[in-house]
Structures are given as structure tokens and as C-alpha cells.
Amino acid sequence: MPELDHLIFASPDLSEGVRIIDSLSGQKAVPGGPHVNFGTKNYLLTFNDKTYFEIIGIDLNQEKPTRPRPFGIDTMSRPALVGYAIHPT
């Protein structure tokens, strides 16, 4: 049976997104890494050995990509839960 892999929370201001989720969860998200050529990077909160929460936002250390950033981050007015990923089993 398929299982939840991760939830995706996007924010045009990554620092703000991390602050929101840290405050709501009572945990501290850890840096994940950059998404090269997408202009984004992420922070992660691990729920268990199979499931995590991804906070994704604009990576100010990368050039703006030639295509729109994923999840509509370029046009977002506020952070939001934007998706999820499923583990096929």
C-alpha cells in the first residue's frame, strides 16, 4: 500500500516559512540543500524514518532560473502547504 513520503510547505521567503513551521511544530527544521537550476532550497523536519516535512523557498544564493520556480513560489503572496509525495510500495 502506498505511504506518505513527505509534505511540502512553500514560502516566497524561506526564513519566514522556517520560522512558521518551527513555531507550529515546536521543533527546529534543519537545512536540506539547494535545488540547482530551480532557484530554491529547503529545510526539513523528520517525522520518522520514512516521513518528513519539507519547507521550500527561494534560494537567494542562486541566479533566478529561466523558468518559474516550482509550486508557484515566484507569485505566492504568503506561505502555504502546496503538496505531498507518496512512497510507492
Predicted regions and their residues:
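Glyoxalase I/VOC metalloenzyme domain signal
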Residues: 1-4, 9-28, 47-89
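Conserved catalytic-core motifs of GNAT/GCN5-like acyltransferases
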Residues: 28-36
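Short acidic/glycine-enriched loop/turn segments that link adjacent beta-strands
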Residues: 37-41
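Short beta-strand scaffold segments in enzyme catalytic cores
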Residues: 43-45
